[in-house]
Amino acid sequence: MLRLALVLAVAAGALCGEPVFSHKTHAPLKIACANCHAGAEVKERAGFPAAAQCQGCHKDWSAKIPSQRVYKVRDFVFFSHVAHKAKTACADCHGDMWQQATVSLFRPVTMIACVECHKEKKATEVCNSCHELGQ
């Protein structure tokens, strides 16, 4: 379900945005984050599912899903899901997605928010671990 929505958005040319999708609608199905965002725990970026996986439930659905960019860090900032997964739960940054009708960021992607979290988790505060030097 979620997978089909994501794939359709990508197929519709939404490569730089996230589909406008209600996780809350699918909450009763108790789908794990990693079922649709494959690789988020082991790769730099969260993955999107293949259409074939979504079509297990959405066999006849051909609607185009509108897209909007939700998360964007500056070009000189590095963010890796795999580096954060060891000490951070998905909900720490994304909130309880199953209660959200639209995709939003629970914790802002700002230097202040990142530094506060790094201090809480006793993570590195070395600038070049997240920033490209010279920027």
Q: Where do the model's predicted regions map?
A:
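Sec-dependent N-terminal signal peptides
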Residues: 2-13
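Short sequence/structural segments immediately N-terminal
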Residues: 13-135
